[in-house]
């Protein structure tokens, strides 16, 4: 019960922090958040918890804020800025994976106490690392495209929820499928893999629903650097 209520609070706090970054630092704040969230989500993902009867990773909340941030960039600054943010996030993830694999290659001192912990967090199996990278770049690029397509058809501010929720729901479906297929398909029995796929997507979808009120707040928000210019 604690996990369920705290997870909702945890998710709300995440989106409030994104808005604070946007308010305080404008467009640059969203770019910084996307880089930070990409790293942080891949640290959190190693911890699994029970949520609403499902086994899930904590990284899904932080990962969901990346879609939220790119949607805000798309809505207020256009798809070109959103795509730039996607490539920033992908480059950050790729660099993190490469650099930390190098760190693990160093032989630890006899007095070292961190190697085992680092291996737990960063010792990705090749399939998991590949699945994460492929899922990120494909789903984030798709999110920008779908958001822009929905906006062309439904440009009204009242339908911001449709643009935000629709693009995220579609792109996260592909994100979940690509990651779980590359990382786990063939390793686990088909029924276990299907359970992982469904439970992961449901958690991500719940995060996208929580984000909707904050999308309207971001739409109305004028960052400090734009107010003074």
UniProtKB/Swiss-Prot annotation:
GO terms for molecular function: transmembrane transporter activity. It is a multi-pass membrane protein. Keywords: Cell membrane, Membrane, Transmembrane, Transmembrane helix, Transport. Signal peptide: none annotated. It is found in: Cell membrane. Its main location: membrane. One of its GO terms (cellular component) is plasma membrane. The keyword Membrane applies. The chain crosses the membrane at residues 6-26, 28-48, 49-69, 86-106, 118-138, 160-182, 192-214. InterPro entries: YhhQ (IPR003744). Pfam families: Vut_1. GO terms for biological process: pyrimidine-containing compound transmembrane transport; queuosine salvage. Involved in the import of queuosine (Q) precursors, required for Q precursor salvage. Belongs to the vitamin uptake transporter (VUT/ECF) (TC 2.A.88) family. Q precursor transporter subfamily. PANTHER family: QUEUOSINE PRECURSOR TRANSPORTER-RELATED. HAMAP family: Q_prec_transport (MF_02088). This is Probable queuosine precursor transporter. The lineage of its organism: Bacteria, Bacillati, Bacillota, Bacilli, Bacillales. The gene is ypdP.
């Amino acid at each position: 019960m604690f996990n369920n209520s705290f997870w909702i609070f945890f998710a709300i706090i995440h989106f409030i922090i994104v808005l604070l970054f946007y308010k305080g630092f404008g467009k640059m704040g969203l770019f910084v958040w996307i880089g930070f969230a990409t790293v942080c989500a891949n640290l959190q993902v190693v911890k699994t918890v029970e949520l609403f009867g499902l086994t899930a990773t904590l990284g899904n909340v932080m990962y969901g804020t990346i879609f939220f941030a790119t949607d805000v960039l798309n809505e207020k600054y256009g798809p070109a800025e959103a795509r730039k943010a996607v490539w920033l996030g992908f480059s950050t993830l790729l660099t993190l994976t490469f650099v930390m694999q190098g760190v693990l290659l160093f032989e630890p001192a006899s007095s070292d106490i961190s190697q085992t912990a680092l291996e737990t967090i960063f010792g990705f199996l090749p399939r998991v690392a590949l699945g994460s990278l492929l899922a990120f770049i494909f789903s984030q690029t798709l999110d920008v495209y779908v958001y822009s397509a929905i906006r062309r058809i439904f440009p009204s501010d009242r339908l911001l929820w449709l643009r935000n929720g629709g693009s995220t729901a579609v792109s996260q479906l592909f994100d979940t499928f690509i990651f779980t297929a590359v990382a786990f398909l063939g390793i686990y029995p088909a029924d276990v893999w299907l359970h992982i796929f469904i439970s992961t997507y449901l958690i991500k979808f719940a995060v996208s629903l929580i984000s909707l009120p904050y999308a309207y707040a971001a739409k109305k928000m004028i960052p400090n650097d734009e107010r003074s210019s």
